[in-house]
């Protein structure tokens, strides 16, 4: 996920773990950032991966007893426990690059479509079977509640919500796609100046939006691709059939960081509220990125 959302977490009393679901968002038009239920899956549904993440100061390593308790708390929805690691490069003696491994535990559902990674400084929940924001937020909060129950979350440094979408449309008779029919004009790049006889087939773009004061930000990465946005060896299973044709990538990363370098106290209610407030600009920008023709097509699927 990219950088980061201003909420005064410290302005309200800290709340302990609870199991009540997040408040329902008010209906404000069509929810385009949804997929289908498992028995309604369309091969061209745009959502490939959704991630919610909370970054926090380093927590104590899980002990044998706390690991057992965490596994028990997550066993109903994420019963499979796996060991995982992230690799990073640092500078070793003499300035030579040295790989370092960040090892952590990951809990997965039986369909291998939802994963919760509990790292020393982050709680990351991902899904390839996204249905809607509220349902996924409930899953995320179950994980956060379980983590907070076995080891206190002492502060919040970043909250993020990320959508990786693959927009697929029919290929023309010449085997190409005129993305101008489907994608909003500002995202089409230099297609309009393509020399005669040549078609623009590749470009990448990025845009960063921030509040005037530190707080919410949104990064959009976009451009056409071939195949899939996710690596074929990604640790989660795709619920849609593999496709190798052209698609248009929309990577929408909405996030929050506290102002002034502060590390506000963790508050469950405000975490849920922040996730909701991050969802709204993601929803808005997604709809703005599509032409009316593509919106109508997605609604028919």
What are these regions (language model features)?
Residues 28-118, 124, 266, 270, ...:
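N-terminal low-complexity, intrinsically disordered segments
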Residues 242-301:
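Long, compositionally biased interface segments
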Residues 46-53, 114-130, 156-164, 245-257, ...:
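Glycine-rich, often proline-containing surface loops adjacent to acidic residues and nearby aromatics
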Residues 132-134, 138-157:
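Secondary-structure boundary elements
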Residues 31, 35, 102-107, 158-241:
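Aromatic/basic-lined ligand-recognition segments
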């Amino acid at each position: 996920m990219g950088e980061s959302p201003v909420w005064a977490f410290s302005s309200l009393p800290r709340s302990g773990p609870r199991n009540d679901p997040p408040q329902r968002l008010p209906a404000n038009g069509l929810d385009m950032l949804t997929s289908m239920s498992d028995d309604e899956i369309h091969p061209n549904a745009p959502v490939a991966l959704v991630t919610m993440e909370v970054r926090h100061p380093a927590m104590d390593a899980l002990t044998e007893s706390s690991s057992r308790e965490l596994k028990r708390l997550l066993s109903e929805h994420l019963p499979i426990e796996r060991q995982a690691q992230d690799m990073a490069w640092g500078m070793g003696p003499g300035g030579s690059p040295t790989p370092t491994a960040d090892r952590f535990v990951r809990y997965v559902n039986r369909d291998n479509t939802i994963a919760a990674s509990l790292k020393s400084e982050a709680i990351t929940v991902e899904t390839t079977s996204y249905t809607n924001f509220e349902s996924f937020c409930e899953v995320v909060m179950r994980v956060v509640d379980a983590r907070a129950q076995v080891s206190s979350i002492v502060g919040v440094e970043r909250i993020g919500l990320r959508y990786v979408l693959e927009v697929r449309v029919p290929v023309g008779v010449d085997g190409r796609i005129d993305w101008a029919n489907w994608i909003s004009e500002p995202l089409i790049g230099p297609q309009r100046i393509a020399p005669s006889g040549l078609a623009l087939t590749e470009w990448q773009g990025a845009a960063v939006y921030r509040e005037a004061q530190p707080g919410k930000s949104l990064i959009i990465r976009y451009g056409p691709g071939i195949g899939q946005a996710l690596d074929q060896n990604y640790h989660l299973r795709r619920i849609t059939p593999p496709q190798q044709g052209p698609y248009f990538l929309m990577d929408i990363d909405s996030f929050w960081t506290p102002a002034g370098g502060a590390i506000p106290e963790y508050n469950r209610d405000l975490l849920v509220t922040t996730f909701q407030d991050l969802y709204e600009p993601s929803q808005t920008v997604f709809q703005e990125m599509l032409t009316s023709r593509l919106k109508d097509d997605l609604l028919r699927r």
